[in-house]
A protein has these predicted regions:
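C-terminal active-site "lid" helix and adjoining low-complexity regulatory extension at the edge
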Residues: 17, 247-268, 275-282, 289-334
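Phosphate-binding site of ATP-dependent enzymes
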Residues: 150-239
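Domain-scale recognition of functional cores that engage charged ligands
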Residues: 97, 116-122, 142-146, 175-188, ...
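Protein kinase-like catalytic core scaffold
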Residues: 132, 199-201, 295-297
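Glycine-rich phosphate-binding loop of ATP-grasp-fold ATP-dependent ligases
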Residues: 110, 132-158
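Acidic/histidine-enriched active-site and ligand-binding environments that engage anionic O-linkages
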Residues: 123-133
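Conserved N-proximal alpha/beta basic substrate-recognition cap immediately N-terminal to
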Residues: 6, 10-124, 140
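A short, polar/proline- and glycine-enriched secondary-structure boundary/capping micro-motif
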Residues: 210-219, 245-246, 306-311
């Protein structure tokens, strides 16, 4: 879809209340005329395929033309997905059961599929793993994920409840290394590492908050960029309310300047995983670091463009598009 086609689609499906709320928000921030802001948002849509959400989230109202050109907007992100990801192979990422089957050697933990006739298998699994992680097979952003303690007394009740709630993926609880776990012990704090054309273009540490089980940014979690070259967190962590943190707000553990252990090994691991399905060239990988090394939690066939280039994480207002373009223009290294 071209720029004009994308803009027309966005206009016809737009939430106009949120659009004008965005205009008022920006007006309160920089006191510019609302009519000017209106046309500036439209201009960003035409030139950069940016919606009003991009305009607000990435503070494009404070960026000049050169800086705006570097932002991976929603429209640009959609175009990259369309170019690099073959729809026939999306099932291996959208469906968590299909993902676990295809990437089993990268999981390093036990798992099973729940069906209406495998209660005995479920009992055997929970004898070995009395605490389990349960997931819907096709939900995103941590929805429906729960950690459950199973006993002989409640095993059948839990089995029936999981069938009723359509949470068919049962996994051994993932474990993580001490350096990452101590940041927020009740959640598995994963690294979201994005590959494009078999190269790493973005890396973030996602950290749980408020004793939640999941670390997702949209579930009150924190996100902190990892320097791809060094493996060091060299910017403050941020939450979805734009609060920034040098230390974790609950555990008081230091986040800024944390060195991710085994970083070079993690990068090799992710690049190798990115080669498993060549037809899917743009993927967001959720990676956990255990004591013995990295392993996959899951992966996303439609990486969001939201946390890569937030204002507190940009240098001189420059977004991620130059790095993405470099990866797209570069032939795979042997």
């Amino acid at each position: 879809m071209g720029k004009v086609g994308y803009l027309i689609k966005r206009i016809t499906s737009m939430n106009y209340k949120q659009f004008f709320d965005c205009i008022n928000y920006v007006h309160e921030k920089n006191h510019k005329n609302r009519i000017y802001i209106f046309f500036d948002i439209v201009s960003c849509g035409l030139k950069y395929q940016a919606g009003y959400s991009d305009y607000k989230l990435f503070e494009m109202y404070d960026l000049n033309k050169s800086q705006r050109k570097t932002i991976v907007t929603r429209g640009i992100n959609n175009a990259i997905v369309k170019k690099y990801n073959n729809p026939e192979y999306i099932k291996y990422f959208h469906n968590k059961l299909e993902f676990n089957k295809r990437f089993n050697k990268y999981l390093l933990r036990d798992w099973m599929e729940l069906t209406s006739d495998n209660l005995e298998e479920f009992k055997e699994f929970t004898k070995k793993h009395s605490t389990i992680i349960v997931k819907p097979i096709d939900d995103q952003c941590g929805h429906g994920v729960e950690k459950i303690k199973v006993t002989n007394k409640n095993v059948e009740e839990i089995y029936n409840n999981l069938l009723e709630t359509k949470r068919y993926l049962i996994e051994e609880v993932a474990t993580q290394c001490e350096e990452i776990s101590k940041l927020h012990p009740t959640s598995i704090n994963t690294m979201r590492i994005v590959t494009l054309n078999k190269q790493i273009v973005a890396a973030y540490l996602r950290i749980g908050n408020n004793n939640n089980v999941v670390d997702n940014f949209n579930h009150e979690g924190l996100a902190a960029p990892i320097n791809i070259e060094t493996g060091i967190i060299d910017y403050l962590a941020i939450d979805k309310h734009d609060h920034v943190y040098e230390k974790h707000p609950v555990t008081n553990e230091q986040i800024l300047w944390l060195q991710i252990p085994k970083w070079e090994r993690i990068k090799r691991f992710v690049v190798q995983a990115s080669k498993e399905i060549p037809e899917m060239g743009y993927i967001g990988w959720d990676v956990c670091l255990g004591d013995k090394g990295p392993y996959l939690i899951e992966a996303n066939e439609f990486p969001g463009n939201d946390i890569y280039q937030l204002p507190p994480h940009r240098s001189n207002g420059i977004g991620m598009l130059p790095r993405f373009q470099e990866a797209m223009n570069k032939k795979e290294e042997e």
